[in-house]
Amino acid sequence: MSNKQIIGFDADDTLWENEVFFHQAQMKFIELHPHIKDPEEVIFQIEKENIKFYGYGIKGFILSLLEASVRFSNNKTDFQNIDKIIKIGKDMLAQTIQLLPEVEETLRHLSEHYMLIMITKGDLLDQQRKVEKSGLLKYFSSTEIVSEKDEQTYLEILEKNNISPKDFLMVG
C-alpha cells in the first residue's frame, strides 16, 4: 500500500454549489401547488421513500416531485404541471457549475503536496457532467461516483486505489 497521504473530496456543496438548486426547484414546485400544507415536509418524505428506487440526484428528485404532484392533486394533476416539473428538472441539469470560493486555489495548492481523489455520490450521468464542467479534473488522480457513501464503499475505493486508511483524509 502507498504511504503517500491522500485527501478525498466530496463534490456537491464541497467543491461547487448544489443544494441551493434543489431548494430553488422545490420553491418553483410549491408555487404550482400553493394549497399544500407543509409541502417541504411532504416532499422530503416522498424523496426519502424513493431513494431506494431512484438513488440520489436530480432525476430522482424530479420523479419524486412528479409523484408529489399526483398525490397533492388526488391523482388529478394536469399535463401542464407535469410539463412544468419536467422543465424544472431540465433547467437543473443544464445549470452551470458554480465553484465555491477559493476551491480551485485550494486544490491547486494541495495537489502539489498530496494525491487528491474525488468521491461523490449521485446519478452517474449527472455527476459526470458536473465533474467535467467544473474544470477541476486536472487536480484529481481519481474520480469515484458512487450510489452510497458508507464505510464499505470507502474501504473498496481505498483498496482499489491501493491506499491505506491511515493515509487517507476525507473532506465533505
Cite the ranges covered by each PLM segment.
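Conserved Lys-Pro-Asp/Glu-containing loop-to-beta segment of HAD-superfamily phosphomonoesterases
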Residues: E151-G172
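Short, acidic loop-to-helix structural element flanking the phosphoryl-transfer center
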Residues: K59, T77-I117, E151, L155
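An amphipathic alpha-helix signature
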Residues: F22-I30, I62, L66, L124
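A metal-dependent, Asp-based hydrolase signature
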Residues: E41, K48-D91
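Substrate-recognition/cap helix-loop segment adjacent to the acidic, metal-dependent catalytic center
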Residues: L107-I117, K121-I145
